[in-house]
């Protein structure tokens, strides 16, 4: 995805004045002047220097660089480091000594190296010994806005193993975290995610516990970089564009750390057509579902068993084939660990589950950590 945006409207206004120009664009750009980057592919956090070719400082009255990530500079040859992997359009707005204003552009691809097992085990590797793990539903939303960077950070701080996040696409094809189709309930804005631009969504603030915060809706890349190397990610896609989601996960170097929730065999097939090694995470309701996904996915590591599939024959077949069980425990539930004295956690244990997704991640982690698995 090519970006030339400001993260939110306030930054847009500040960036405009930071370059000290209120000129409007002039005619066609001079054929001889060009923007050059010291590297057009660069790792996140690494510096890249931008220069104007075939022109001297004496030929220029001023220059404003827009790096495409909300940051700007008025230096003649600035250096910049990107913190989020993505593809960025860098724009140099140049006021020539003649008074003409021209725009020159270049593209920079920012990436992160794939996390290997020496940094953090892959999801299949982490499931191999079948120790109990906990997944924070929509992040740790009891202490931060759901589907937010701070909710991810809170889960990490509390030693939670997984987070579940929901991904949707904006009108201009950017991927953001949002469970509902609209932003009405979780931000101070209104409208469908699919009808709003990324910049529009970024101009609103997330709610927490009925109060407006200073936190914005994160992009998928921002969320992944917050999680990178610290917590596993279950991506629940509310869209069918698996390719776009996969590309961002790969660019963030998080393929081994993420699993992609699928509900249909065709969705799993679409993912595997992109990358046969991707961590497919099916939701299973019946034995036919399990059989279908097992025949399609080589070395299926984990499935989510809907409560309809909590049957001995289904579970035993999965477990005997080395498949770990993921189950919901106190998710969108009137019961809590306190009101039912952890009975639903005990049911999860008796069913042989490995990963418990919950709205009470800290409570379940403490409880399960005190149990020894047979």
What are these regions (language model features)?
Residues 10, 70, 83, 87, ...:
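Residue-level marker of positions within ordered structural domains that often coincide
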Residues 20-29, 107, 111-374:
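Phosphate-group recognition and catalysis centered on beta-loop-alpha active-site segments
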Residues 19-122, 126-128:
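Extracellular/lumenal mature domains of secreted and surface-exposed proteins
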Residues 2-10:
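Sec-dependent signal peptide recognition
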């Amino acid at each position: 995805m090519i970006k030339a945006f400001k993260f939110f409207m306030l930054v847009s206004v500040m960036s405009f004045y930071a370059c000290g120009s209120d000129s409007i664009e002039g005619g066609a750009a001079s054929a001889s002047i060009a923007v050059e980057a010291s590297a057009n592919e660069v790792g996140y956090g690494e510096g890249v220097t931008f220069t104007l070719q075939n022109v001297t400082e004496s030929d220029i009255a001023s220059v404003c660089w827009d790096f495409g990530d909300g940051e700007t500079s008025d230096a003649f040859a600035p250096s910049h480091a990107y913190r989020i992997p993505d593809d960025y359009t860098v724009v140099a707005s140049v006021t020539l000594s003649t008074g003409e204003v021209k725009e020159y552009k270049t593209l920079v691809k920012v990436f992160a190296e794939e996390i290997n097992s020496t940094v953090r085990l892959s999801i299949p590797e982490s499931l191999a010994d079948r120790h109990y793990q906990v997944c924070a539903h929509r992040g740790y939303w009891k202490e931060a806005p759901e589907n937010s960077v701070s909710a991810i950070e809170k889960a990490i701080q509390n030693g939670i193993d997984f987070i579940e996040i929901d991904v949707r696409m904006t009108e201009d094809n950017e991927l953001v975290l949002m469970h509902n189709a609209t932003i009405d309930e979780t931000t101070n804005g209104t409208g469908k995610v699919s009808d709003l631009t990324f910049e529009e969504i970024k101009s609103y603030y997330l709610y927490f516990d009925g109060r407006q915060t200073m936190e914005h809706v994160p992009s998928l890349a921002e969320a992944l970089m917050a999680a990178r190397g610290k917590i596993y990610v279950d991506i629940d896609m509310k869209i069918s564009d698996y390719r776009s989601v996969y590309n961002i996960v790969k660019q963030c170097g998080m393929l081994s750390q993420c699993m992609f929730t699928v509900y249909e065999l065709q969705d799993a097939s679409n993912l595997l057509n992109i990358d046969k090694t991707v961590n497919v995470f099916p939701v299973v309701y019946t034995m036919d579902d399990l059989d279908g996904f097992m025949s399609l996915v080589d070395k299926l590591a984990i499935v989510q068993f809907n409560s309809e599939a909590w049957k001995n024959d289904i579970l035993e077949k999965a477990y005997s084939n080395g498949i770990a069980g993921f189950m919901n425990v106190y998710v969108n539930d009137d019961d809590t660990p306190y009101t039912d004295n952890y009975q639903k956690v005990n049911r999860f244990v008796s069913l042989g589950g490995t990963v418990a997704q919950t709205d009470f991640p800290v409570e379940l982690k403490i409880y399960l950590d005190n149990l020894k698995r047979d």
